[in-house]
């Protein structure tokens, strides 16, 4: 009898110890996530889950936490052009978020996060489905913009433009979303759809609304002016006077202001600032320069002259960027 009692006590102690270990790993994982030590957090979340003794709610908490860490790591992989690693990490995140949604299908935050990972993995249809489900729970302009980005990426330009228009008309307010940004996003979709007059109107509105809040951003204004000019040029409009006026607000001797000097014929292509010695920064500069030079050639009717720089943009631009998307659309149009 005593022997059976000792065995029972030992079993209780073992179970209690396992439960304590699982709970301790979960708390440690959350602490590691707070500190920004992603690898450690993933390991601890995994240990907590494999212990097999977490409550149902704690399992969901661990899945959410690990999924978010996988997503964060995937962005680092993308930054270093490790595309396969980025996709694998997002696949892991999607699996964790899917487990959470199996238990709580109305978790809008997780629907959005899974949608973002689907989008980054070029799986646009499931991304759109997740954003649509999230919109039924929370009709937010920022979610509309995220769905618009996925629609735009798959070539559904009309639907993307409609989502941006709905975001502009929404009575809801997102603290981290500016109206000028919505005009920009709609402008990009219109540009991709070859609706250049409409794109120019939206880029112009974005410039008007956003200039004061982005005054300290030395990159924002030159790029904004570049997109506005290209939309005008592709629409067959002569915007020289406006471009000359805007050029006075940027340093045309320093990148990316040199783009404006190039468009005005004040700077030759070979004289534009060379690529940065910093890898990612240099690729980003070459990406933008190649695309804008190609678009400028298209605006002047020089399709053959445009082909090589746009091909180069498609090669060097990160696959998650708008520039990569625009380059692909232009190359497809050149086939016709």
Positions of predicted regions on the chain:
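Residue-level recognition of tetratricopeptide repeat
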Residues: 30, 68, 75, 116, ...
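Helix-start (N-cap) detector for alpha-helical repeat units in TPR-like alpha-solenoids
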Residues: 22, 56, 60, 108-109, ...
């Amino acid at each position: 009898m005593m022997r059976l009692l000792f065995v029972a006590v030992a079993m209780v102690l073992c179970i209690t110890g396992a439960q304590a270990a699982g709970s301790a790993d979960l708390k440690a994982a959350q602490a590691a996530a707070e500190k920004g030590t992603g690898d450690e957090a993933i390991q601890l979340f995994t240990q907590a889950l494999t212990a097999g003794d977490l409550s149902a709610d704690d399992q969901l908490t661990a899945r959410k936490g690990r999924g978010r860490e996988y997503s964060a790591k995937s962005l680092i992989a993308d930054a270093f052009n490790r595309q396969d690693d980025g996709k694998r990490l997002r696949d892991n995140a999607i699996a964790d978020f899917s487990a959470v949604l199996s238990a709580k299908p109305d978790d809008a935050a997780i629907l959005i996060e899974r949608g973002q990972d689907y989008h980054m993995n070029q799986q646009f249809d499931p991304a759109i489905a997740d954003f649509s489900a999230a919109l039924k729970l929370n009709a937010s302009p920022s979610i509309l913009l995220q769905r618009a980005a996925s629609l735009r990426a798959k070539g559904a330009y009309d639907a993307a433009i409609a989502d941006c228009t709905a975001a502009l008309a929404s009575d809801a307010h997102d603290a981290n979303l500016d109206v000028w940004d919505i005009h920009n996003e709609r402008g990009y979709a219109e540009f991709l759809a070859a609706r250049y007059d409409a794109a120019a109107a939206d880029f112009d509105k974005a410039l008007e609304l956003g200039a004061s809040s982005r005054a300290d951003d030395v990159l924002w204004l030159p790029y904004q002016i570049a997109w506005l000019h290209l939309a005008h040029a592709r629409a067959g409009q002569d915007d020289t006077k406006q471009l000359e006026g805007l050029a006075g607000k940027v340093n045309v001797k320093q990148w990316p202001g040199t783009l404006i000097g190039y468009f005005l014929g004040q700077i030759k292509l070979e004289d534009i600032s060379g690529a940065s010695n910093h890898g990612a920064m240099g690729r980003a500069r070459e990406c933008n320069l190649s695309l804008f030079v190609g678009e400028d050639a298209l605006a002047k009717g020089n399709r053959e002259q445009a082909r090589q720089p746009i091909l180069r943009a498609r090669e060097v631009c990160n696959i998650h960027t708008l520039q990569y998307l625009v380059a692909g659309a232009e190359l497809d149009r050149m086939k016709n």
